[in-house]
Amino acid sequence: MKASETLIVIGREFGSGGRALGRELSKRLSVPFYDKELLHQAAKQFGISLPEFERNDERKPSVLRSMVESAFGMCPANSSNVNSDTLYALQSCVIEKLARQGGAVFVGRTADYVLRNNPRLLSIFVHCDEEGRARRIVKRGDCKTQEEALDMARRNDRLRQSYYNFYTGRQWGNAANYHLCIDLGKLGLQTAVDIVLHATFDLAQRIK
């Protein structure tokens, strides 16, 4: 297998730099990068408004999922009453479709779980100390102060954790659920990129 055929999936703490890592890996491997682009693709493919997806993006639904499996064969086009479970199933369907097209970098959206049985998967979790996360959040303009940034980070982490745990039955951020965990604050972006690339090329050599 070629390294460029690897499916790199990045879970991340809010403000940890996981998206920046994903974009750099995408450039180095010349493969597509999917983050919120997944929402656009899912919305377009299934005829559901983008705001509908964005409202439910990485947020735990208020109802128990009852349609996840069956929804893979559904196309509720233009529905104004599509629930979170169906949106999750449709997004998962898009992830699987994109994975069949070749190598890619996916950020979030439980893509590591959706693709868990794919031998080309390399799953990563990115974390960082709170001070580093706060600095990054302020620098990109999401907040004005460190205190506001920390509050935003913690709130978004709770949402991601609830969403991930609900749909996967796994524990978000638990090292046992990922192939590689990286402290981006300690290692820095370029070192992290080098580590993941090394793992990617090693995985490619071992898969025929």
Give residue ranges: language-model regions.
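Pre-Walker A (Motif I) flank of P-loop NTPase domains
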Residues: 3-8, 12, 102
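Glycine-rich phosphate-binding P-loop
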Residues: 10-26
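ATP-dependent small-molecule kinase phosphotransfer cores
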Residues: 43-103
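Small-molecule kinase domains that catalyze NTP-dependent phosphoryl transfer to phosphate-bearing small molecules
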Residues: 63-68, 144-190
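Short, amphipathic alpha-helical "lid/cap" segments that border enzyme active or binding sites
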Residues: 92, 189-197
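ATP-dependent NMP and nucleoside kinases share a basic, alpha-helical "lid"
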Residues: 92-141
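C-terminal helical "lid" subdomain and adjoining coupling/linker elements of P-loop NTPases
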Residues: 204-208
